């Protein structure tokens, strides 16, 4: 049985004021993993019809800065957001349809990869994006190439 996230408590723990837009954005990001801003805005607007687009952008920025939401932006793609934060995972992106899936780190602890030379930086994260074809697109691609 999965537990229902306590968004108000998450906000308080991050020293953020609990507001309806913040709770609605957390709910939307949790319900729509890897969603773009438009999808999140639509979900929030459904729950709070009077919320502005700018308010959603501002909340996403605040939640990302507080570490409650993670922003990812694969090359050539719009920014997307997820609620899976603070763990050791990366992403797989379909080159054809753009779908994104989580993939756990294969080896080690965060940051998951060890740079051969960190150039004096204190490393705390490695962002890895795998690219390929999702199962649906690979089936379509195979069926097109083999009549």
UniProtKB/Swiss-Prot annotation:
The segments labelled Dimerization in the record are 86-147
Which terms are listed as keywords in the entry? Cytoplasm, DNA-binding, Iron, Metal-binding, Repressor, Transcription, Transcription regulation, Zinc
Gene3D superfamilies the UniProt entry points to: 3.30.1490.190, Winged helix-like DNA-binding domain superfamily/Winged helix DNA-binding domain
Q: Which GO terms describe its molecular function?
A: DNA-binding transcription factor activity; transcription cis-regulatory region binding; zinc ion binding
| Assembly and oligomerization | Homodimer.
The entry assigns this protein to a family as follows: Belongs to the Fur family.
Q: Name one GO cellular component term.
A: cytoplasm
Species of origin reads: Mycobacterium tuberculosis (strain ATCC 25618 / H37Rv)
**Where are the annotated segments for DNA-binding?**
1-85
Q: Which GO terms describe its biological process?
A: negative regulation of DNA-templated transcription; regulation of DNA-templated transcription; regulation of secondary metabolite biosynthetic process; response to iron ion; response to oxidative stress
Which signals induce this protein?
A: Negatively autoregulated.
Q: Which residues bind Zn(2+)?
A: 34, 82, 91, 94, 97, 102
Record SUPFAM superfamilies: Winged helix' DNA-binding domain (SSF46785)
Explain the purpose of this protein.
Represses transcription of the catalase-peroxidase gene katG and its own transcription by binding to the promoter region in a redox-dependent manner.
Taken from the record, one Pfam family name reads: FUR
- Keyword Transcription regulation attributed: yes
Localisation per UniProt entry: Cytoplasm
Q: Which residues bind Fe cation?
A: 87, 89, 109
Q: What is this protein called?
A: Transcriptional regulator FurA
């Amino acid at each position: 049985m999965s537990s229902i996230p306590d968004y108000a408590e998450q906000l308080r723990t991050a020293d953020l004021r609990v507001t309806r837009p913040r709770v609605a954005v957390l709910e939307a990001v949790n319900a729509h993993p890897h969603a773009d801003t438009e999808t999140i805005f639509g979900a929030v607007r459904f729950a709070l019809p009077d919320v502005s687009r700018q308010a959603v952008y501002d909340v996403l920025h605040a939640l990302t800065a507080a570490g409650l939401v993670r922003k990812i932006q694969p090359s050539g793609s719009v920014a997307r957001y997820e609620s899976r934060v603070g763990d050791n995972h990366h992403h797989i992106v379909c080159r054809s349809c753009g779908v994104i899936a989580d993939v756990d780190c294969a080896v080690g602890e965060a940051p998951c990869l060890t740079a051969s030379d960190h150039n004096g930086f204190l490393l705390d994260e490695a962002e890895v994006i795998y690219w390929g074809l999702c199962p649906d697109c690979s089936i379509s691609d195979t069926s097109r190439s083999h009549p």
